[in-house]
Amino acid sequence: MNAYDYYGEARALAEALKNAGFPAYGSEISGAMDEGETGTEIFMMMRARLANLLADGKLPPDLIARLRALHGRLNDALT
């Protein structure tokens, strides 16, 4: 069983992004949890949005590392 707290990390990451001056980026992540109907849909939306945020290149290294980690875990869960 996978005990990783995807939603908890996503919420914490969204808050960290907002606190670091990237409120729109944080809203992208939290929005996926609000907009998705099923767990799979939420995971797919978060994975896509995280990929877009990673491609942006404006974030500090610590947040990039957290985005990559969550993106990787979501990718593993969906494949």
What role is predicted for each listed range?
Residues M1-T79:
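C-terminal-biased regions
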